[in-house]
């Protein structure tokens, strides 16, 4: 090998901090006899190496091949420089240029939090290992990252572990290039790391020392108590999943009467009697992100293990959310309890996640019976991520811990000179930042109807603008005039002197999927959800929830078809009272006198019904909405499944549960295609008319006595056929082949799977959300893309 000296300066961008990149390069550079510095800097890793040029070129070739996930190189800036004289000696790992994160919503290079790796799990269980049962075991391949970061770049002094100096034994591992904890910033042991504390709800100490605290916490759980656990990105509430009374008590105290709970298990072997494990399930569960994975319930009454999860846990859902431990502390608790545990977010419903022990004791005092704390502070709230499986591949429904703040991998990255900040929606808020050709989607923040969530989001957005404002050319938000996010956007745009663009809700849903797949267009897109606002375009309604769009770069989005609008008596109240949606359907279709309508009409008080009907007759307080979500709510109420709901999508979930169950096949009903009828007014798009479907539903239920489960499946199949045929009609007219399926309604597995298969059978290519949520959690990406594609 040539001895001529050369110097190579590399800037590595992507997921490069907290993933062992510098130790990897250190080992490679040692083998190649190179010298220099390996530094974390804000947003990148900077390598300044000197040695023989062939050796440096070999490092360039090998580096991308040797990276181990989740490490990821999205960009590599290479510069050859004159060699230093005298030549540097040795290799030095360090960091430079501190940037405080504050409440910032994204970081540009830091890995997400990672669940315990296999080696750490083995050490945790090994009585001979010095970290046996240490609740905070980690290495450079796993452990907390974003949840403890207070500044960039990644180094121990920039985390909430700064107050825990390493003992001599840990320091030796940290400095040993041959040790897997070489420069692992999160390591520690029982001699130098964080400690546990267990308190009763009244503040009394229940135990002292890690082992005593764990034992007492397990005893509390086994007695049916509710434990508030300081987990990775915030507090969790735990109860034994088999204890139906404890689960119901948790529901009352948390004010979450019906939304399904997820369960935590220490080992997938416990799942065989509880859920189906389709292809991809185990891989999704073992992902280092440790998400909640939605799996089909299949409790076998004959298997005693089926009793490990009481019926109130899933609350009638066809799916059971399951997760493996995201931290060694969770693993110890689950293993010591020896049973499945309900694991839900540590907050009263609708409020932000608790992250501070004092805050948790105050806000959860009437919820939890005990509090298991530790003294490693949480820097920012991070909910659990949620995925479902489509064809064996994970599809994100909530992008949070374990996935954020990793930059999105887009097939067609935007131009490096564009800088935009999009706020997303008021529900499932998750802003997105576009900078230097990369998009970062912030972790799920919750719903802005909570004043505390709104304050937290405003602080995070302000931190983003303070840091990256000079590189931005504008802000983007939803076009709804009453949106909370829109008000925030107005204030921020004015204070930072930035232009503001507003994007219609469904345009953003559709463009988000186009961005994820790198689809250039022309594209068709079904956008279907609860409600989204649209700007005035000459139509008779602006509240929409099911429309077929034509997308093409540089052209305005065209609306090709939509669902026939239905009146919503009481406006927003219809979203929480499916009986109002049903009343609007029956009134619009002139079916109030049908015998099958009486079950729904009887859900109203004698005094309320005449007032609502009078309002419908006069068109007062009954806005029109072409909403698939509200249509589904109305059908559920017509069938008598649910008249008032306590959480978003509850009625639709009950319909899906019936349709997915074994009883649905008891009666086979031919699908009914919704006719695509011309609109009443010139210039308006044709409408899928739901009235024949409603009339037939009433007849089947009242006259033919068809059970509810086959009816629910029939409704799903009829809608699938109608959406697929609508796409075929538009594809022939406009020469399109790709069809986007976007919006929260396509979280319904039956709808998504049916539409995917139906479109593919016609030679069309379906596109759907995978690495970003189909619901409003993916809106911000679509808002960015809508602006970029309009240029």
Task: Set out the residue ranges of the language-model regions.
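A contiguous, well-structured pocket-lining segment that forms one wall/lid of small-molecule binding clefts
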Residues: 186, 193-194, 425-463, 584-736, ...
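Internal gly/pro-rich beta-alpha loop/helix module
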Residues: 66, 173, 336-414, 620-625
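Active-site histidine-anchored catalytic micro-motif
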Residues: 514-587, 591-596, 617-618, 622-626, ...
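Intrinsically disordered, low-complexity, mixed-charge
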Residues: 1-186, 190, 194-197
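Short beta-strand scaffold segments in enzyme catalytic cores
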Residues: 237, 292-294, 384-388, 429-434, ...
């Amino acid at each position: 090998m040539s001895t001529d000296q050369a110097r190579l300066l590399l800037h590595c961008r992507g997921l490069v901090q907290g993933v062992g990149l510098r130790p990897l390069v250190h080992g490679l550079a040692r083998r190649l006899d190179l010298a220099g510095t390996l530094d974390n800097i804000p947003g990148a890793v900077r390598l300044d190496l000197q040695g023989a040029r062939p050796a440096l070129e070999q490092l360039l070739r090998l580096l991308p091949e040797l990276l181990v996930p989740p490490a990821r190189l999205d960009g590599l800036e290479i510069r050859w420089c004159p060699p230093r004289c005298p030549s540097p000696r040795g290799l030095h790992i360090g960091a430079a240029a501190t940037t405080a994160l504050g409440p910032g919503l994204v970081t540009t290079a830091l890995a997400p939090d990672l669940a315990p790796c296999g080696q750490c799990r083995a050490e945790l269980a090994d009585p001979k290992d010095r970290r046996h049962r240490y609740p905070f075991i980690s290495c450079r391949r796993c452990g907390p990252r974003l949840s403890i970061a207070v500044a960039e770049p990644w180094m121990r002094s920039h985390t909430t572990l700064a107050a825990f100096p390493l003992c001599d034994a840990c320091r030796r591992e940290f400095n040993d290039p041959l040790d897997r904890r070489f420069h692992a910033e999160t390591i520690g042991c029982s001699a130098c790391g964080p400690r546990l504390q267990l308190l009763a709800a009244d503040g009394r100490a229940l135990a002292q020392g890690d082992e005593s605290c764990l034992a007492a916490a397990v005893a509390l759980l086994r007695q049916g108590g509710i434990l508030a656990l300081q987990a990775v990105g915030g507090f969790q509430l735990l109860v034994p999943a088999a204890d139906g009374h404890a689960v119901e008590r948790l529901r009352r105290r948390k004010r979450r009467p019906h939304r399904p709970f997820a369960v935590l298990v220490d080992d997938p072997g416990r799942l065989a009697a509880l859920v189906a494990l389709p292809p991809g399930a185990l891989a999704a569960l073992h992902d280092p992100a440790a998400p909640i994975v939605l799996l089909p319930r299949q409790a076998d009454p004959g298997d005693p293990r089926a009793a490990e999860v009481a019926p109130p846990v899933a609350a009638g859902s066809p799916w059971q959310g399951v997760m493996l431990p995201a931290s060694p502390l969770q693993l110890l608790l689950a293993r010591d309890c020896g049973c499945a545990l309900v694991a839900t977010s540590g907050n009263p419903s609708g409020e932000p996640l608790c992250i501070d022990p004092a805050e948790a004791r105050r806000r959860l005092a009437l919820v939890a019976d005990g509090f298991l704390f530790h003294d490693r502070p949480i820097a920012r709230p991070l909910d659990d991520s949620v995925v479902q499986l489509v064809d064996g591949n994970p599809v994100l429904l909530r992008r949070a811990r374990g996935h954020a703040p990793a930059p999105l991998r887009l097939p067609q990255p935007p131009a490096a000179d564009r800088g935009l900040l999009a706020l997303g929606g008021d529900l499932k808020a998750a802003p997105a930042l576009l900078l230097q050709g990369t998009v970062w989607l912030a972790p799920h923040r919750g719903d802005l109807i909570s004043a505390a969530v709104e304050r937290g989001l405003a602080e995070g957005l302000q931190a983003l603008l303070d840091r990256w404002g000079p590189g931005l050319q504008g802000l983007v938000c939803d076009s709804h005039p009453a949106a909370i996010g829109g008000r925030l956007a107005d204030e921020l745009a004015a204070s930072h002197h930035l232009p503001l663009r507003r994007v219609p809700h469904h345009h953003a849903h559709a463009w988000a999927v186009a961005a994820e797949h790198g689809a250039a267009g022309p594209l068709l897109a079904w956008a279907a959800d609860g409600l989204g606002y649209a700007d005035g375009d000459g139509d008779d309604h602006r509240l929409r929830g099911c429309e077929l769009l034509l997308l093409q770069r540089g052209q305005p989005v065209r609306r090709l078809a939509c669902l026939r609008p239905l009146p919503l008596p009481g406006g927003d109240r219809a979203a929480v009272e499916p009986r109002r949606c049903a009343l609007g359907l029956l009134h619009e279709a002139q079916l109030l006198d049908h015998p099958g309508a009486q079950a729904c009409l009887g859900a109203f008080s004698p005094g309320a019904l005449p007032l609502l009907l009078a309002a419908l007759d006069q068109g007062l307080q009954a806005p029109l909405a072409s909403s698939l979500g509200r249509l589904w709510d109305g059908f559920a109420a017509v069938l008598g499944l649910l008249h008032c709901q306590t959480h978003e999508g509850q009625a639709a979930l009950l319909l899906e549960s019936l349709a997915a169950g074994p009883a649905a096949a008891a009666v086979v009903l031919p699908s009914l295609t919704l006719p695509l009828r011309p609109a009443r007014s010139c210039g308006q798009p044709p409408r899928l008319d739901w009235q024949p479907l409603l009339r037939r539903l009433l007849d089947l239920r009242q006259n033919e006595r068809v059970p509810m489960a086959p009816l629910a499946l029939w409704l799903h199949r009829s809608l699938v056929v109608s959406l697929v045929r609508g796409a075929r009609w538009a594809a022939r007219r406009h020469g399109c082949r790709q069809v986007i399926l976007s919006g929260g309604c396509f979280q319904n597995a039956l709808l998504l799977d049916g539409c995917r298969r139906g479109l593919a059978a016609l030679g069309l290519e379906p596109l759907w959300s995978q690495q970003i949520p189909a619901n409003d959690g993916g809106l911000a990406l679509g808002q960015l893309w809508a602006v970029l594609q309009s240029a």
